[in-house]
UniProtKB/Swiss-Prot annotation:
Topology versus the membrane: Multi-pass membrane protein
Keywords: Cell membrane, Membrane, Transmembrane, Transmembrane helix, Transport
Subunit structure: Forms a complex composed of CedA, CedA1 and CedA2.
UniProt induction comment: Up-regulated upon UV stress.
Protein name: DNA import protein CedA
Gene designation per UniProt: cedA
Taxonomic superkingdom: Archaea
A cellular-component GO term for this protein: plasma membrane
Amino acid sequence: MLNPFQLLFYSQLLASLTYFIGAAIYALPVPVYGVKKWAPRLITDSIYVVVWNSIYLGVLLFLGELLSLLGVTWDGYFSWLNNILYIEQSLYLMVKTILTASNAVPEVSALIQVVPFGALLTVITSALTFTSTLIAVSKIVYQYVAVFIATGVLFLSIPFRIGRSVGGAFIGSGIVFYVGLPYLPQFLAAFQMLPTQELNTPPQNASAIIDYYVHVVPSIITSLVIGPVIYIFILVGFSMGVASLVSGYGSRLPLIIDVF
């Protein structure tokens, strides 16, 4: 596992190199604006990286405080995801059993003519794949958020702003997804898209199966696929905004530093 403090150490070295390059460009006896303009930029970039190194631990503590203010925890979020995964696996097993029994039981075979269980199985499989992927991504964000931010600072420290956009993307994604992902259940609840208790109650007869398909399948699609996907896209948008803020706009940095 990468050590975030080692990454910050390397970023500090690169920041020092960037500063000395800027100072050297200032001292060049070449009155060419295209060259001289890099001197203040490099010096401000190096100071900006030093600021990020200084507030690194404070940023991590601030993220924890944001989670507390939102009233969410990663443990609760993972518990919710595992419960969703259990529901999807139960639904998959139920539909798979019905499809298997259709070859031997005429009543079940007739039921399949009414209810398109093949399409239902495809929907459940898609939801199962999405939830499994979301769990894997969430674990990566939870375990490596410190590394993401430190890697972003390292890219910010590369001279001549070569890695500025990449560094901003690492920092923005780490911050937004670490705070935003655990809020997914609350987001779905706010728009009444949480999985209903009916999803966890398998039907007992043919008429119940038809009713289950008519009323519950839309809930499967909205609560297990559409809702989470919309929320992920919202987080992506926020992370892009934070990335732009961190890396600056055009030739400007978000930190106001005057270098003469």
